[in-house]
A protein has these predicted regions:
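Beta-strand-rich domains and repeat architectures in extracellular enzymes and scaffolds
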Residues: 19-52
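Beta-propeller domains
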Residues: 40-73, 109-111, 124-125
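Asp-box/WD-like beta-propeller blade repeats and closely related beta-sheet repeat scaffolds
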Residues: 106-155, 159
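Short loop/turn segments immediately following beta-strands, especially the blade-tip
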Residues: 172-176, 237-248, 348-352
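Blade-loop segments of beta-propeller domains
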Residues: 60-99, 103-107, 112, 131-139
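Conserved beta-strand positions in repeat-built beta-propeller and related beta-rich domains
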Residues: 41-48, 100-104, 111, 158-162, ...
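Beta-propeller fold detector
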Residues: 63-73, 130-134, 177-192, 244-260, ...
Length: 353
């Protein structure tokens, strides 16, 4: 990985403490996970680049397909159950596992291919697939975009950014359930647009981009799941209610509470003390929300343009910068991406992780 200090294309001075950890012209990195000295990155197929779905950065600038080449070799018409069709998130758990969230849809806004949507756990000690959790047609619906994952005990929680809702996954049985389908707490509001470079991000038909349930975190004590659409605001609900399949949909909905009125965010990470780090898209900034609700700016820099899915590891917060709004999809087929794509890291206070 390169430690080169550099300036972005707008010549703004890079802030002290912000380090370029790696860069590439092959992938659009929207996710990162760290295991000791190993750094993993991932990016969605619909971004239109030619790198692997998941890569291990080899310490120079190379990208090694992970866990192997075959899992990264999906082509239209090939097996979707043992390959990555479209990776949207990777996440390291507390038991030496790397989780991969495959939306199952190779196109943005498309339907998951039959049998393709899944959560895959890789054993980091052996670099082999430990278990595959299929997200069947009752969970990954037409229009679903399974987005990200968090854990508590024997359960995992996933967001669906396409068909608004949450997914509860029993890690022992493998059974998955949809909850809060179409609820206001998981649905993108119409009055909070995503603004980047001073303009509303729009779909090819000209309508504002709306992303349903996307960011989520579990409180350090495991009591609450915090969640919301990408646009905000955030809500919370007790995990014990989510974990109980006997709780009715109406009772579950009645127990959703307002939590934090955050702006549109690219991604979040929660520290052990309950501090929520989030990337403020419009302001190209990393901010933090203290447990008492106070919000402060950690670092602001034009190079942090649409930071997605940060990760806390080794005393740093790792910040992939995919520049998603600059992809051709959102600009009538013309790319506005400023190459190279970069992964930054920023040193945090000792208590952060």
């Amino acid at each position: 990985m390169t430690g080169t200090q550099a300036q972005s294309s707008d010549n703004a001075q890079q802030p002290d403490g912000l380090i370029i950890a790696a860069e590439t012209r092959r992938m659009i990195w929207n996710a990162v996970a760290v295991d000791g000295d190993r750094v993993f990155v991932a990016g969605p197929r619909w971004a239109g680049v030619n790198g692997p779905a998941i890569a291990l950065i080899d310490g120079k600038d190379g990208l090694i397909p992970y866990p192997d080449a075959s899992w990264n070799a999906w082509q239209p018409g090939s097996d979707v159950t043992k390959t990555f069709v479209n990776v949207n998130a990777i996440r390291r758990d507390d038991h030496n596992g790397l989780w991969v969230i495959d939306t199952g849809s190779p196109t943005f806004g498309g339907d998951p291919l039959p049998g393709a949507a899944k959560a895959v756990r890789i054993d980091l000690a052996t670099n082999r697939i430990g278990r595959i959790y299929p997200l069947g047609p009752r969970v990954a619906l037409p229009g679903s975009y399974v987005d990200d994952i968090r854990f508590h005990g024997d359960h995992a929680y996933l967001t669906d950014a396409g068909r608004a809702g949450l997914i509860v996954l029993d890690l022992r049985s493998g059974e998955a359930r949809r909850v809060l389908d179409g609820a206001p707490s998981v649905t993108a509001p119409t009055g909070r647009p995503i603004v980047m470079d001073g303009e509303i991000v729009r779909m090819p038909d000209g309508s504002p981009l709306r992303v349903n349930s996307d960011p989520l975190e579990v409180s350090p004590d495991g009591r609450y799941l915090y969640f919301g659409s990408l646009h905000g605001p955030w809500s919370r609900i007790e995990t014990r209610l989510l974990d109980d399949p006997g709780i009715s949909a109406s009772e579950l909905a009645s127990n959703v509470e307002a939590w934090a009125d955050l702006p549109p965010v690219g991604g979040t990470a929660m520290a052990p003390d309950g501090t929520l780090y989030f990337t403020d898209l419009a302001n190209e900034a990393l901010k933090k929300r203290a447990p008492d609700g106070t919000i402060t700016t950690v670092v602001q820099y034009p190079g942090l343009h649409w930071v997605d899915a940060p990760a806390l590891a080794g005393g740093f917060i790792w910040l992939p910068v995919p520049q998603l709004d600059r992809l051709p999809l959102f600009h009538k087929g013309t790319s506005k991406v400023v190459w190279p794509i970069r992964l930054y890291r920023y040193k945090l206070d000792a208590q952060a992780n």
